């Protein structure tokens, strides 16, 4: 993605400046710094214009320390996925971790962080009546988070998984 610069605002600048444009943020402190997230939230005041995405690999939640992808070795350490040279190679977080990050590191209210992971992205893709909500006729995908925002239980289509 193009970087934000004083002479060339790039994609980030366009996302922040255009009020009718929504943007997803990987809230892990590696892809986007806490200060940058705060600036983005101040710039995009319309509810739902910033939402959480994970960019996570299938290894998220496993004990794997490394894996191969397209012939390249990916290393996992301290919440980061990197190439051998240290270049960021993807995210190693689920959305519950992003919600915790937004609450504890960025300092936004719990309910706002939950909306950024649920209803806001479902509205963005036009599925707000099916996913990201608990309404009659919706899929009934939801989770139970404890007071520390850790996942305690998961339901998909109304069926308990864990």
Which residues are covered by each model-predicted region?
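Active-site-adjacent C-terminal substructures of enzyme catalytic domains
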Residues: 1-112, 117, 123-128, 145-150
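A general structural motif at alpha-helix termini
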Residues: 117-118, 138
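C-terminal cap of metal-dependent C-N hydrolases
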Residues: 123, 133-162
């Amino acid at each position: 993605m193009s970087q934000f610069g004083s002479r060339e605002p790039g994609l980030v600048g366009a996302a922040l400046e255009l009020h009718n444009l929504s943007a997803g943020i990987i809230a892990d402190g590696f892809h986007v710094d806490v200060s940058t997230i705060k600036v983005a939230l101040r710039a995009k005041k319309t509810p739902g214009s910033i939402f959480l995405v994970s960019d996570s690999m299938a290894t998220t939640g496993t004990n794997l320390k490394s894996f191969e992808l397209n012939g390249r070795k990916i290393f996992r350490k301290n919440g980061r996925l990197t190439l051998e040279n240290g270049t960021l190679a993807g995210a190693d977080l689920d959305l519950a971790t992003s919600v915790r990050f937004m609450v504890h590191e960025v300092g936004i209210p719990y309910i706002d962080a939950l909306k950024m992971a649920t209803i806001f992205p479902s509205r963005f893709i036009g599925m707000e009546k099916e996913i990201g909500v608990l309404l009659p006729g919706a899929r009934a995908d939801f989770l139970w988070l404890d007071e520390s925002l850790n996942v305690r239980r998961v339901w998909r289509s109304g069926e308990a998984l864990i």
